[in-house]
Each structure stands twice: as C-alpha cells, then as structure tokens.
C-alpha cells in the first residue's frame, strides 16, 4: 500500500487580502493606491458636501469679517462655495484638534484644508492607480501621464499658489462664483492673460476641443457601411471586432484635400498620440504658469510702452488692461487694505527715453 502525504495549500488572511486588492478580476480595480485613494476621496467628498450645504461663515481675510459660503447661510448654487481658511492661519496646518473648539475651527475655515489635502492625496493616488492597473494588464503607462495634467493644475491652484502667496486664504474657493473670483483676482494681481504659459494653456484646451471635434466628425463621416438605411449605424460595430470600423484612407483623403496633404495624419497611432499630447502639454504649461506666478513672476508688463516726442504716453491695449487690473485690485478684499501694492509703492522713477551720447 502506498500513502501520499500532501501539505494543504492554505493561504493566510494577509495573502488573500493582497490577492483581492491586486486582482484585475474585480468589477472595480482597487490596487494599493486605491487603499489610500478611497478613504481620502470619501473624506474630501463628505466634508465638501456638508460644508457646501451648512458651514458657518469664515473669516477668510483674518480681519474678523466672516464671509458666508454655504447654502443654509443665504447662498444659492451659483454663489455657494467652501470658503478658504483664514489669513490668520496662513500656511499653518490646521486640523480639528488644533482648534480650541469646533466652532473656532469652522470660523477659521478648517474644512477647506481638510478637503483640499484629502482631495490632492486622493487624485495623486488615482493617478498611481491608473499606472498600477495598466501595469497589471500589461498596458503602456500613458493614461496616468495624460491624467497628470489636471492633477498638476489642481495642485497648482490648491497648494502651490497658496504656498507662494503665504496663505491658504489665497487658494481657489471651492464653488462656481468662487472660481471666477479667483480667476479675476489672479488677473488683477499677476496679469495672467499676458503670461506665455497661460497662452499655451488656452491653445491646449481650445485646440484639444477642436481636434477632438474634428477627429470624431471625420471618423463618424467615414464609417464603413454595415447596416441598412433603417438601422442605426452604431449597430454596424461589434465590440472586439478585429477589422477597422471606419475608412482611415477616406478620412485622410478628405482632410488632406480640405486643408493640405501634410495636415492630415496617415498613421492612426501618431494621430491618437497627437490628440492626447496637445491638450496635456498645454495644461502642463498652464499649471507651470500658475506655479511661477505663485511666487510673483508675473505676466508681461508693457505699460507705457509707447510715448510721443514730448514723452506723453500713448495708451495701448496693455495700458487698458493695466487700468482694469488696478480697478479690480482696489475692489477685492476691500477692507483688508486701502490701496493695492501697485498704487502704494510711491512715485514713479524716471527712466531714460533716449540713449546718452557717447563722446569720442
């Protein structure tokens, strides 16, 4: 008689947990980045919803003049926002346990810091989770690279800009009109419209929208007929089919004749790389622009660039923009200061209008 002994293959609880976390068979992939992403995004979302609805007014400027931001304190869906933490807090980390009471924490805008820090950690981990799932499936890593653009933009306005300005009270307000207020004040203080990196960001967003519309309409217009006139053309595609569902040669020929030959891609892979890269690079530059202006390396200043023979200024559009910027600057934070820095800097220093003559 032969006896066979075999050790039982029983994985311990930790190994089973690891297998479940990293399994690509789950309906939603979790991953190790997801272990951090899920609780942080949940915390940010729950706090945002509660604060947006019911947070009491916040002393944003640190001068004991609270600003109401929530729906229950008189705002509507357009004007409501989570108001940034107080200028009295500055760049200090302000968790709940650092305040003397919950009322003090709310008055100083503590929920804003809780939301943005958890949100930023969450989207960083979402980007890492994209890479992790791509790695597990044997895919190339360009999806998280593309997502790095909005991550960089969010990091710029929620973290880098407040660090450069010295206070989280200067961060992006979490609401609709609050976002517009941030944009307008940013223009007044940094002249962002005259910054080349912002211009590249505009080209990236508008160009990306244009290219997406062009690509979608070209493909839709050159579908290979698989259905009758009475059926939807969408039924002509079966998920996972090997053959192309549209005629790229026809699309290339059309667009090459509409513009010129070399404006049209004849390689599907390079085309789709271009469609991804254009808006991503543009938004990277926009985020870089915010991050440099955070430290007051501002947009171009062409004020008083044109003068006549008597030295009188001939206004250009740059001067019109400058006057608008100063007007906006004197209106915002109306009780925090009397004059903007541009007006409080003293008399203008004279500059030479002509080169001095050089004696031999």
From Swiss-Prot:
Q: Which residues bind chlorophyll a ChlzD1?
A: 118
Which reactions does this protein catalyse? Answer: 2 a plastoquinone + 4 hnu + 2 H2O = 2 a plastoquinol + O2
Please tell me where chlorophyll a PD1 binds in this chain: 198
List ligand-binding residues for a quinone. 215, 264-265
Enzyme class, top EC level, equals oxidoreductase
Instruction: Kindly state which keywords UniProt assigns to this record, in alphabetical order.
Output: Calcium, Chlorophyll, Chromophore, Electron transport, Herbicide resistance, Iron, Magnesium, Manganese, Membrane, Metal-binding, Oxidoreductase, Photosynthesis, Photosystem II, Thylakoid, Transmembrane, Transmembrane helix, Transport
The question of whether Protein transport is a record keyword is answered with no
Recorded protein name is Photosystem II protein D1 2
């Amino acid at each position: 008689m032969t006896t066979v002994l075999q050790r039982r293959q029983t994985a311990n609880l930790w190994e089973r947990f690891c297998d479940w976390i990293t399994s690509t068979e789950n309906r939603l992939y979790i991953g190790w980045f997801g272990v951090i992403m899920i609780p942080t995004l949940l915390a940010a979302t729950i706090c945002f919803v509660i604060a947006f609805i019911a947070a009491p007014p916040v002393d944003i400027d640190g001068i004991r003049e609270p600003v109401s931001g929530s729906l229950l304190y008189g705002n509507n869906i357009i004007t409501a926002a989570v108001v940034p933490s107080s200028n009295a807090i500055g760049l200090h980390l302000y968790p709940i346990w650092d305040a003397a009471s919950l009322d003090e924490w709310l008055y100083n805008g503590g929920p804003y810091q809780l939301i943005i820090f958890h949100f930023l950690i969450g989207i960083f981990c979402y980007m890492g989770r994209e890479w992790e799932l791509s790695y597990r499936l044997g895919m190339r890593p360009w999806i998280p690279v593309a997502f790095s653009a909005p991550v960089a933009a969010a990091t710029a306005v929620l973290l880098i800009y407040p660090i450069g300005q010295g206070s989280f009270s200067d961060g992006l307000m979490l609401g609709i009109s609050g976002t517009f207020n941030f944009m307008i004040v940013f223009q007044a203080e940094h002249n962002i419209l005259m910054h080349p990196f912002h211009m590249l960001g505009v080209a990236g967003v508008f160009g990306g929208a244009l290219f997406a519309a062009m690509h979608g309409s070209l493909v839709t217009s050159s579908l290979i007929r698989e259905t009758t006139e009475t059926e939807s053309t969408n039924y002509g595609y079966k998920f996972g089919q090997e053959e192309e569902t549209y005629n790229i040669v026809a699309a290339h020929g059309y667009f090459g004749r509409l513009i010129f030959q070399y404006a049209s891609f004849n390689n599907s892979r390079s085309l789709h790389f271009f469609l991804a890269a254009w808006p991503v690079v543009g938004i990277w530059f926009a985020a870089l622009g915010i991050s440099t202006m955070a430290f007051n390396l501002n947009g171009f200043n062409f004020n008083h660039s044109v003068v006549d023979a008597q030295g009188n200024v001939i206004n250009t559009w740059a001067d019109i923009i400058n006057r608008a910027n100063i007007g906006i600057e004197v209106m915002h934070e109306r009780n925090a200061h009397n004059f903007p820095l541009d007006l409080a800097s003293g008399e203008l220093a004279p500059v030479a209008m002509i080169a001095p003559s050089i004696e031999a």
